[in-house]
Swiss-Prot record:
It is a single-pass membrane protein. It catalyses: S-ubiquitinyl-[E2 ubiquitin-conjugating enzyme]-L-cysteine + [acceptor protein]-L-lysine = [E2 ubiquitin-conjugating enzyme]-L-cysteine + N(6)-ubiquitinyl-[acceptor protein]-L-lysine. The RING-type zinc finger domain mediates binding to an E2 ubiquitin-conjugating enzyme. This is RING-H2 finger protein ATL20. The chain crosses the membrane at residues 172-192. It is an enzyme of class 2 (transferase). It comes from Arabidopsis thaliana (Mouse-ear cress). The lineage of its organism: Eukaryota, Viridiplantae, Streptophyta, Embryophyta, Tracheophyta. GO terms for molecular function: transferase activity; zinc ion binding.
Length: 299
């Protein structure tokens, strides 16, 4: 295990550490990842097959989601935990590697029941464990832990501070926690409220602007939009935590100029793959049949 990683979280009670790649491509690091020579090991792991396919290969029935940081203009990179699918690849696809990947145990049932290609729950970070030194007992009992001596990894419980000192600090700690909790809750509530108001206002303005464009002078040819069944036939994508979209799409809706949020649903144009909030693009397509970004229309 070598190289530089970002430490996202450390759980001392479970003795787990969550790490990620500074360049935001943890999958690439996993292909050469090895915990030998380090105190860390995999907790729960699952076997994945990594593969690459030319971009012209279309596999719609598999709902295949590519790994953006390893894909390029000619080929796309994928991963699957389904061994059956990995054996039924088109001839133009190639298996790059198969290996066990550390996965948070909360994804166990999702991966086991999966019928298609994986959404790669470990795309952002990897969860590792360590067993030595073992301080689980200390952490579980909220005690202090230390080494018995400098030449050993054995641990021992350390003496607690005098009761008098703890009794003086306890009221202060409780007061600070209450004040901090109330302040944080108020700030979070204000930010959420303002954010929702801002997003809703932008979307309303975008919808009004789209409607106003239909008010053409007499004698001017008015471009008709699409019917609802055609609009619904355009692909919809539910965003994950990373909010990544295929192609040149960013994390901002080009219509309302609001950032996408995780779990939001976007709709993509079939010819150019430009994506937008479902509410925004649906309003637009009722009036126009072309993409708001590149003006390509469905032939």
């Amino acid at each position: 295990m070598s190289g530089t990683f970002l430490v996202d979280e450390i759980n001392y009670q479970k003795q787990q550490i969550s790490i990620s790649d500074p360049e935001n491509c943890m999958v690439k690091r996993l292909l050469t990842f090895n915990t030998s020579g380090s105190p860390f090991s995999y907790g729960f792991s699952f076997y994945y097959t990594f593969l690459t396919c030319p971009n012209e290969v279309v596999i719609p029935v598999w709902s295949l989601m590519s790994i953006p940081c390893l894909s390029n203009s000619t080929s796309s990179f994928f991963a699957t935990s389904n061994l059956t699918f990995s054996k039924l690849l088109p001839p133009s696809c190639q298996i790059v590697k198969g290996l066990y990947v550390p996965v948070d145990v909360i994804y166990k049932d999702v991966i086991t029941e999966e019928k298609g290609f994986s959404t790669v729950p470990w795309l952002g970070n990897v969860l590792l464990e360590w067993s030595s030194p073992n301080c689980r007992g200390c952490e579980k009992e909220s005690l202090r832990c230390g080494f018995k001596n400098k030449a050993s990894l054995e641990v021992k419980y350390l003496a607690d501070p005098p009761d008098e000192t703890k009794s003086r600090l306890r009221p202060l700690i409780i007061t600070l926690c209450i004040i901090g909790g109330i302040t944080a809750t108020c700030i979070a509530a204000i930010r959420i409220y303002n954010s929702e108001r801002f997003v809703n206002q932008r979307r309303q303005n975008a919808a009004i602007t789209a409607r106003n464009t239909t008010q053409q002078p007499r004698g001017v040819v008015v471009t008709t939009g699409l019917d609802q069944s055609t609009i619904e036939s355009y692909k919809k994508v539910e965003l994950g935590e990373s909010r990544r979209l295929p192609g040149t799409n960013g994390i901002i809706c080009p219509i309302c100029l609001s950032e996408y949020a995780s779990k939001e649903t976007v709709r993509c144009m079939p010819e150019c793959d430009h994506c937008f909030h479902v509410q925004c693009i649906d309003e637009w397509l009722k009036i126009h049949s072309s993409c708001p970004v590149c003006r390509n229309s469905r032939s």
